[in-house]
Curated annotation (Swiss-Prot):
EC numbers: 3.2.1.130
Chain ranges passing through the membrane: 10-30
Keywords (A to Z) from UniProt: Golgi apparatus, Hydrolase, Membrane, Signal-anchor, Transmembrane, Transmembrane helix
Subcellular localization: Golgi apparatus membrane
GO molecular function: glycoprotein endo-alpha-1,2-mannosidase activity
Region span, Catalytic: 60-462
Protein name: Glycoprotein endo-alpha-1,2-mannosidase
Superkingdom per UniProt: Eukaryota
Topology within the bilayer: Single-pass type II membrane protein
A GO CC annotation given for this chain: Golgi membrane
The reaction(s) this protein catalyses: N-{alpha-Glc-(1->3)-alpha-Man-(1->2)-alpha-Man-(1->2)-alpha-Man-(1->3)-[alpha-Man-(1->2)-alpha-Man-(1->3)-[alpha-Man-(1->2)-alpha-Man-(1->6)]-alpha-Man-(1->6)]-beta-Man-(1->4)-beta-GlcNAc-(1->4)-beta-GlcNAc}-L-asparaginyl-[protein] + H2O = alpha-D-glucosyl-(1->3)-D-mannopyranose + N(4)-{alpha-D-Man-(1->2)-alpha-D-Man-(1->3)-[alpha-D-Man-(1->2)-alpha-D-Man-(1->3)-[alpha-D-Man-(1->2)-alpha-D-Man-(1->6)]-alpha-D-Man-(1->6)]-beta-D-Man-(1->4)-beta-D-GlaNAc-(1->4)-beta-D-GlcNAc}-L-asparaginyl-[protein] (N-glucan mannose isomer 8A1,2,3B1,2)
Amino acid sequence: MAKFRRRTCILLSLFILFIFSLMMGLKMLWPNAASFGPPFGLDLLPELHPLNAHSGNKADFQRSDRINMETNTKALKGAGMTVLPAKASEVNLEELPPLNYFLHAFYYSWYGNPQFDGKYIHWNHPVLEHWDPRIAKNYPQGQHSPPDDIGSSFYPELGSYSSRDPSVIETHMKQMRSASIGVLALSWYPPDSRDDNGEATDHLVPTILDKAHKYNLKVTFHIEPYSNRDDQNMHQNIKYIIDKYGNHPAFYRYKTRTGHSLPMFYVYDSYITKPTIWANLLTPSGSQSVRSSPYDGLFIALLVEEKHKNDILQSGFDGIYTYFATNGFTYGSSHQNWNNLKSFCEKNNLMFIPSVGPGYIDTSIRPWNTQNTRNRVNGKYYEVGLSAALQTHPSLISITSFNEWHEGTQIEKAVPKRTANTIYLDYRPHKPSLYLELTRKWSEKFSKERMTYALDQQQPAS
């Protein structure tokens, strides 16, 4: 009997040793960070839902997305409150990727909700009618009704948020920092102006500048086509921006090859103003000229049609950008024309700034515009555009957009959401951070390649 007990103890000990060895072996084979755990330091961002490391199979993605969707939906019930991110710890910038100040992203601060603004703004965007009544009658009309029905084909991870919410602004800055975006190009209207579906937003600029500075981001201005925009009020508005915000450490200035540090202004829909009017502002002899004054800058025109090239030269602009995320929509947004545009810019001493987007879909507000939809193809469309931009050796690259949700060009985090009437698009089978991660990847590639051909490698002036 004693001999049997001894044998049993030996066998049991060997079995325990085998199990222990097996567990240790598996532990060594399993990576410290699973394939789909938070990469690139994104675990530093305030997350709405904790992300557990898992094997990354399709079932895991679907299960995780269901949890995200359910949590998001619950948080949005009752007055559509902004989904507040978890309180962040002190920012450790050393753990975040380096910034690329030659990569800009168009940023919109026009969103609002009842919690912060007393009503929904922009999320309840009206459905726009086609200009031809014969076509318009075939499509729905009316207005979106947040929080479950918003004017977008995607749904934000932060819900129908307010651009006034400081925690939302901070989360946006963290996301851009995680993507190695160095500069946000802020959509801007003068203090007494607004877009057709929004409210005045200039009062938000100080908070945006402060939050950007916390992450070493810079802010430049994307001047919208406000009512009656001309040389005189543009001069006044440029003076206003520089006088009010120009001394902030987050205010962006570009160091030119001649050593000057100048503010930069993207001018949206510049082509609707006659070249002779722009020349009054942008040429040295103009009646409203800012040249060689404290209000001089780099003024970047939107090139839509090929014929705009000569208008831009006559106007006195310093460069061009293409804005639209739909390849083939305009001459300027068509990748196949970018090499020619770059040659034109080099010949005429202009900056060339191609604009790249992750996709395009605006059918939530323009249901008749399906011909301009561009599928994201799980990030491939975005990467093709970024590759085409890099091949031109551009001065800068602009991203359309960080958060233009109406046109489906956002790289901001989006989550799955389903309602009784709508199934929103999302980034599956990838994570909500897919386009931030792709942006970081190409930002690093652009930074390295730019060093091989550009002379202006300085950091932006503070």
